[in-house]
């Protein structure tokens, strides 16, 4: 295969994206199609899924291929991305069996890593009929989840016609964050019928803290006792989304 190059203009933003994916998985397969870059991966417990889609137009350089698959170990990649400086670009050069990753700024730093094949089945999009959608400030969600983590190992999301309530309780205490539909931190609010579900905080704390560095806005979709859907728009285009299974009462 001839060398193909993928270049993203904001390496720091790309580092945040990789951080947000690595909350769930240590390695994963990427797919380049002629319209964009994609990733979909399931955690080892099969209770959480991450979905990444970045359109071709978001890249400075993009491979001229119909389809290209490559797998990366995020531990090795994050070693390089820790050295990202403001204004750096990141490029990936794909050769047979390996990927040369460069940080391009005042200097060029690079590593060469193997393109691994991560074994796993094709993952369909979960079929959930959601009854509540709230678009709100992502840092509010991150703070609410962090507060919940201080007192419990699970958090409850409740959507009514008037508000979204995020709460947690245990012997350590109680926490409640209420987002009224008319709050200045709520940008869209559509509740067709009330919904509530409980979720483990195992991933939610890291997901919300890391993705709030990417996007100022989060879209939350709920249905009673169904997986929660969290979606974060990427400034350059595209989005990173999560499905997290509920805890059964």
From Swiss-Prot:
**Alphabetized UniProt keyword annotations:** DNA replication, DNA-binding
Instruction: Extract the PANTHER family matched here.
Output: PROLIFERATING CELL NUCLEAR ANTIGEN
Q: Name one Pfam family in it.
A: PCNA_C
Q: What does this protein do?
A: Sliding clamp subunit that acts as a moving platform for DNA processing. Responsible for tethering the catalytic subunit of DNA polymerase and other proteins to DNA during high-speed replication.
State the similarity comment: Belongs to the PCNA family.
- Extract the Gene3D superfamilies matched here: 3.70.10.10
A molecular function annotated in GO for this UniProt entry is:
DNA polymerase processivity factor activity
Q: Organism source for this protein? A: Pyrobaculum aerophilum (strain ATCC 51768 / DSM 7523 / JCM 9630 / CIP 104966 / NBRC 100827 / IM2)
According to the record's subunit comment, the protein's assembly and interactions are: Homotrimer. The subunits circularize to form a toroid; DNA passes through its center. Replication factor C (RFC) is required to load the toroid on the DNA.
Organism ancestry? Archaea, Thermoproteota, Thermoprotei, Thermoproteales, Thermoproteaceae
Q: What is this protein called?
A: DNA polymerase sliding clamp 1
Listed GO biological process terms: leading strand elongation; regulation of DNA replication
Which InterPro entries does this UniProt record tie to the protein? DNA_clamp_sf, Pr_cel_nuc_antig, Pr_cel_nuc_antig_C, Pr_cel_nuc_antig_CS, Pr_cel_nuc_antig_N
């Amino acid at each position: 295969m001839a060398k193909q190059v993928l270049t993203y203009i904001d390496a720091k933003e790309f580092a945040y994206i990789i951080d947000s994916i690595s909350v769930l998985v240590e390695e994963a397969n990427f797919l380049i199609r002629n319209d964009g870059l994609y990733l979909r991966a399931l955690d080892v417990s099969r209770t959480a899924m991450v979905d990444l889609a970045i359109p071709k137009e978001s890249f400075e350089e993009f491979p001229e291929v119909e389809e290209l698959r490559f797998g990366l170990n995020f531990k090795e990649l994050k070693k390089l991305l820790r050295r990202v400086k403001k204004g750096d670009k990141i490029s990936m050069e794909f050769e047979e069996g390996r990927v040369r990753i460069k940080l391009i700024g005042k200097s060029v730093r690079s590593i060469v890593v193997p393109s691994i094949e991560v074994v796993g089945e094709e993952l369909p999009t979960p079929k959930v009929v959601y009854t509540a959608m709230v678009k709100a400030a992502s840092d509010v969600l991150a703070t609410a989840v962090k507060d919940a983590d201080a007192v419990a190992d699970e958090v409850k999301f409740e959507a009514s016609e008037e508000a979204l309530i995020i709460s947690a309780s245990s012997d350590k205490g109680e926490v409640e964050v209420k987002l009224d539909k008319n709050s200045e931190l709520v940008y869209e609010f559509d509740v067709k019928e009330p919904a509530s579900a409980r979720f483990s905080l195992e991933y939610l704390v890291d997901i919300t803290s890391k993705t709030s560095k990417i996007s100022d806005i989060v879209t939350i979709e709920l249905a009673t006792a169904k997986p929660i859907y969290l979606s974060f728009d990427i400034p350059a285009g595209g989005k990173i989304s999560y499905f997290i299974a509920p805890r059964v009462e």
